[in-house]
Amino acid sequence: TALFADIPDWCTVVITLPTGMEPDGRLSFIKQLKSAGKAVNFTAQTGTPLNNWIARRFEANGKRIDRDAVDRLVFLSGDLMNRLIPEIAKICGYVPGDRVTAQDVEKLAHHIPEADAFQMTEEIARRNYDGAAAKLAELFAEDAEPVEIMGVIGWQVRQLYAAKIAEKSGRGVPFLMEILGTSSEYRARKIAETAAKFSLPALTNGVRLCAECAMKPRENGAITDAEAIKEFLICFAMESRRA
């Protein structure tokens, strides 16, 4: 309390926390901090407000970005502004003209693991197994732990399964957006398009294979053998081809 009492009236102290971090309200310091100040939540922008902000950032750099390129950028690099700012600067620096296309974004933007996992399933749906293996290699190149990689892949397969169930029940993209918890029509549509290329048995088997891979022998609470994930890719590809 004495620490906060020493702050003069003309001074404002701002303490920021990383996205997704929630302060532990049981700690005495956090209790004192909240009593002395005010907690303000900054929610992440999504949908149209985020897309408009991206377009303005490109305009500030003398570029005009196509609408489908905006959707592709958010899909590949995520919707966090602090992650998008350096990506926008990089793309503007490399694109020679004043127009930025979806092809430019595909070539230059950093792919978050979720995007690589989705593209891996896209390649399996196309029966381009070399392409799927290449995408898995990109996931491994990110230096993430195997358990994290399998978590991302499993999440993606479950989304495809949900999209397939929605398709079978005659529900459209708005319903899919709701059950996936996304405000991006582009993302929901891409997932629906890819799910349509799989059979329901293939995706059912995919969910089962993900669970089996997650239950592989563990050491110190983490999957230590990346071979288990490679085995999953082979089995999922075979099941998808057979189903």
Task: Annotate each PLM feature.
Residues T1-A243:
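Conserved beta/loop motifs at nucleotide-recognition and modification sites
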